[in-house]
A protein has these predicted regions:
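Contiguous beta-sheet cores, especially beta-hairpins with glycine/small-residue-rich turns
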Residues: 172, 197, 260-422
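Structured extracytoplasmic
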Residues: 11-158, 166-172, 177-264, 421-422
Length: 422
């Protein structure tokens, strides 16, 4: 009887459109992920650029906010402030473009029980991974997306795409464009791109936003652009404690019931972290990194952080980049240090690392290009570009030009602590 049912199921699935079965599994999986998403907060770093009508794009400012996801809502506070309020991020900026809804809004629309339209577009390569792409549409009457500008506020429909891992069913990127924009909003185009990655919170992996990009074009010709990075995510209402195993074993972190998050370290301290976790090209983004502080960290000749204090973080970025013969882009995010019973949030700039073959903080690109002139002949141009990676508190990013990646246990990174507010 079971064999007959299996044959009937196989015959039924053979008649499905391409990608339909995978879509069903992706949506079901994402509903489960959203249902178990805990109360958690992250540091949100927003880099804003603005181009006036007829002008050129220039940096506007950098904003940092604490964002708390709770009960399918996002609420905000100033960095280091635990007094979250039910407000919009624009309340902290006064003007300019800034968006929200990264944790659940876009994912909920895709994974929800509503009857949206989907179209399978095949597999595409994204950051070195083969992902299934789907186009989708959220009609205005089913949309929870709103745009707020100084001229007003309005709900918009969405047409977009998402990319899902066929093996894990995780949605790893969403690209959404507003449509059916109300006439009261002076907007020509509004585009959002969100990347998701696994983040380990108190020993459990959750799918959280890692970065987002926004682009808003107004009728006037003004163009606003945002890049957002989410770092230092942790459970809200729980704090980790640390226990040590046998000699030589890396420290272990566990959850305890403490409302307040850890304290912030003073700026301008030099901290050397020796990693206990081996990192290779097979390590997944979001994987937990454990390490220890090497050498005492002093303040006014007193030991603030003793040698051997445990450090915790995650692999924030690990992807293959084809530029200049190929290299790995590696981002290591350290979030907390435990010292003498006090847990410190780790905000610091990467200063140095151990030397490894092919490891560098930047990559130089030399280009030799020949252009054909309209009236005959040609012109040769040489250019020199430097690739560099974003500067985020507590995140060390670098390139490794090698076909295989191996950051061994004992690999050391040197940091200088910084103030949270720039």
């Amino acid at each position: 009887m079971l064999g007959g049912l299996g044959l009937a199921w196989a015959a039924a699935t053979q008649g499905l459109p391409p990608g339909a079965l995978l879509l069903s599994r992706v949506r079901a999986h994402m509903r489960e992920e959203l249902a178990r998403l805990p109360n958690c907060s992250c540091l949100e770093t927003v880099t804003r650029d603005h181009q006036p009508a007829g002008g050129v794009m220039r940096p506007l400012d950098t904003i940092r906010l604490e964002v708390l996801y709770s009960d399918r809502r996002e609420i905000y506070a100033s960095p280091g402030d635990r007094g979250f309020r039910d407000n919009q991020p624009m309340d902290f900026t006064g003007s300019g473009l800034i968006g929200n809804g990264h944790f659940a809004l876009f994912l909920s629309e895709i994974a929800g029980e509503g009857s949206l339209s989907y179209e399978y577009k095949g597999e595409e390569s994204l950051s070195g991974r083969r992902l299934a792409r789907y186009d989708y549409r959220v009609p205005l009457n089913m949309s929870g997306n709103t745009i707020t500008v100084p001229e007003g506020r309005g709900t918009v429909g969405i047409k977009g795409s998402f990319w899902a891992d066929p093996a894990t069913y995780d949605i790893l990127r969403i690209a959404a464009e507003a449509e059916d924009i109300p006439p009261s909003l002076p907007i020509v185009e509004y585009v959002t791109v969100i990347d998701y990655a696994h983040t380990n919170l108190a020993g459990t992996d959750f799918l959280l936003p890692q970065s987002a990009d926004y682009r808003l074009l107004e009728f006037s010709g003004e163009l606003s652009r945002n890049h957002i990075e989410f770092t230092h995510c942790h459970l809200y209402g729980a704090q980790s404690s640390v226990s040590f195993g046998a000699r030589g074993e890396p420290p272990r972190f566990a959850a305890s019931s403490v409302l307040e998050m850890n304290r912030e370290l003073l700026p301008a301290l030099q901290v050397v972290i020796r990693i206990s976790t081996r990192i290779t090209e097979k390590t997944t983004v979001g994987a937990l990194i454990l390490g220890v502080v090497e050498g005492n960290v002093l303040r006014r000749k007193s030991v603030l952080i003793p040698d051997g204090s445990p450090v915790r973080g995650r692999v924030r970025r690990l992807e293959w980049n084809d530029e200049k013969g190929g290299s790995y882009i590696v981002g290591l995010e350290f979030t907390e240090i435990e010292a003498a019973g006090t847990r410190y949030r780790f905000f610091a700039d990467l200063v140095d690392t151990d030397r490894l073959p092919g490891l560098s903080r930047t990559i130089s690109m030399f280009r030799h290009e020949t252009d054909t002139l309209p009236y005959g002949g040609s012109m040769t141009r040489d250019s020199h570009d430097v690739l560099f990676l974003p500067d985020l508190p507590g995140v060390g990013s670098f390139f490794v030009q090698a076909r295989q990646l191996d950051l061994p246990p004992g690999f050391r990174t040197t940091w200088k602590t910084r103030a949270l507010v720039p």
